[in-house]
């Protein structure tokens, strides 16, 4: 289908007819409360959240989700199905042996992975943003056979605190990402007061 949109106010000067732009209908975006669920043995990923409004994910069990347990995506390049997340709270969840397979967006147990074709020249950030809470990940329990816990790309505002990370040997480690945290084009990131039972708190910033 083709739609014609008529604006009542002038558009920002950055928006021109020289390139394409994606439009999200904010009036159709919900707040999300996702609690007390068991997510188990899923293919590809456990859950995918994508709304600019408040999202709370708490008291869930993510058990052997195969791919990433929680994905915050963002795509106007292929799937055309997700926009930015501005206010996400992930707390008091249990994550057991995610990432037993490799699929799209499976960079860590929690992957914040918008598709940005030219990240090097991106001037702003896709997720989070000025005046927004961004993504807070706190008071969770991670049990994992591999290394990556959090992957984040193009986000302004990210907190990872008061989490417990326990290493096990249930499966052979195989993931190409050998660090706990990998951060690409991020700002206002806090990683603090976490308990890594094996002492590995490795962070890669790019």
Language-model features, listed with the residues they occupy:
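Extracellular parallel beta-helix/beta-solenoid repeat domains
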Residues: 1-206
């Amino acid at each position: 289908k083709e739609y014609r949109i008529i604006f009542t106010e002038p558009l920002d000067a950055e928006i021109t007819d020289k390139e394409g732009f994606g439009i999200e209908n904010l009036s159709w975006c919900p707040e999300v409360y996702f609690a007390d669920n068991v997510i188990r043995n899923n293919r590809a990923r456990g859950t995918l959240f994508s709304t600019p409004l408040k999202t709370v994910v708490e008291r869930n069990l993510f058990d052997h989700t195969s791919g990433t347990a929680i994905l915050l995506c963002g795509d106007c390049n292929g799937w055309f199905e997700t926009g930015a997340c501005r206010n996400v709270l992930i707390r008091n969840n249990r994550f057991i042996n995610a990432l037993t397979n490799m699929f799209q967006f499976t960079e860590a147990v929690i992957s914040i992975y918008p598709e940005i074709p030219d990240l090097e020249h991106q001037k702003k950030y896709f997720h989070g943003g000025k005046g927004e809470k961004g993504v807070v990940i706190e008071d969770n329990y991670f049990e994992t056979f591999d290394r990556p816990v959090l992957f984040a790309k193009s986000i302004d505002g990210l907190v990872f605190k008061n989490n417990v990370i326990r290493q096990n040997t249930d499966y052979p480690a195989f993931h190409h990402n050998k660090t706990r945290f990998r951060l690409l084009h991020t700002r206002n990131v806090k990683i603090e007061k976490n308990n890594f039972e094996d002492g590995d708190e490795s962070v890669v910033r790019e």
